[in-house]
Amino acid sequence: MQSPLEHERLVQLIKWIDENTAGLAFPADDRTMLAIGCFDVAIEHQAAIALLASASIHGSAFALLRVLAESLVRGLWLHACATDAELAKFKRGKLDKNFQTLINEYELKIGTPSGVLSNFKTTAWDSLNGFTHTGFHQVSRRHTPSRLEGSYPDEEVAKALGVAGALGMIAAGQLLAMSNQAHLFDTYNKKMTEYANTAL
C-alpha cells in the first residue's frame, strides 16, 4: 500500500516545516501580516489533513485540500500582487477576485503565465470542489459492499497526501523568504527537491 508510506513522508515533512519556521520574525506591515496569515493557515490545513488521514477520516481530509490550496494562493497573491486598495478590501472581507484570477495575476507577476498553479487548477479543481462541497467525487466514495462508510482507493489517498505536502511546503518556503532566512534557502530547496522526487 502506498498511503502509509506517503503519510509517514508527510508527517516527517510537517515536522521539518515546524522546526524551520518556528520563531520566525516578520515585518509588521499589512501586506506581510495578511500573507503570512494565509501561509500559516495553509500549513495548519496540511497538518490537519495528515491527522485526519492517520484516523482514516479521508472524506474530511480530501475536503480540506481545496481550502489548503486557496489559503496558499491567497497568500501568494496578497504578498505579490494586491494593491493597497485591494489589501483594504480583503481586510473588510470583500475580495471580489475568483481563484483563477488570483492565480493568473500571481503567475503573470512572477513571469510564469500558465504555470504550475494554473496547471494544478486545470487538472484538479473540479474534483477538489466535489470533495469540499460534497459533490459526486465525495459521495461516490461513501459506499462499500457491506456497509456505508468511506471507501477511498489507496492510490487516491497517497496522491492527496502528496499534494498536501507539496502545497504546505510552498507555504513554508514563502515564510522563510519573507523572514529573510537566506541561510535556510539551500536546505529548503534540497528538502523540496527530495520530497518532489520521492512522490508516489
Residue ranges and their predicted role:
Residues 1-38:
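N-terminal, Lys/Arg-enriched amphipathic/low-complexity engagement segments
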Residues 6-14, 20, 149-200:
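Amphipathic, Lys/Arg-enriched alpha-helical patches that create a basic surface
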Residues 6-9, 38-41, 64, 117-120, ...:
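Amphipathic alpha-helix face/heptad-repeat signature
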Residues 13-17, 38-48, 64, 71, ...:
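Amphipathic, well-ordered alpha-helical segments in soluble domains
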Residues 19-34, 50, 54-58, 63-127, ...:
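Short non-catalytic regulatory patches outside canonical folded cores
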Residues 80, 84, 140-143, 176, ...:
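Structured alpha-helical bundle/scaffold domains in large eukaryotic membrane-trafficking regulators
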Residues 123, 132-143:
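Substrate-binding/catalytic groove segments of enzymes
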Residues 140-152:
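Acidic interhelical loop/turn segments
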